[in-house]
Amino acid sequence: MKQLEIKNLSAAELQAKLVQLKKTYSDIKIAHAISPIENPLQIRSLRRSVARIATEISKRELL
């Protein structure tokens, strides 16, 4: 997810997206541990998206 897209989301949407991405990330990690997935770069992309959203949430709490 792009940083500009994240900035345009509301706080509730950010929380919902964070929960959704964390669940997807854990599902893919488990699937990858059992048998390798086709695109392992998807794991890195999801992990970074989770970090971007968590950072935006923290940034908004400070303001």
Swiss-Prot record:
One of its GO terms (cellular component) is ribosome. GO terms for biological process: translation. Keywords: Ribonucleoprotein, Ribosomal protein. GO terms for molecular function: structural constituent of ribosome. CDD domains: Ribosomal_L29_HIP. InterPro entries: Ribosomal_uL29, Ribosomal_uL29_CS, Ribosomal_uL29_sf. HAMAP family: Ribosomal_uL29. NCBIfam families: L29. Belongs to the universal ribosomal protein uL29 family. This is Large ribosomal subunit protein uL29. The lineage of its organism: Bacteria, Pseudomonadati, Bacteroidota, Flavobacteriia, Flavobacteriales.
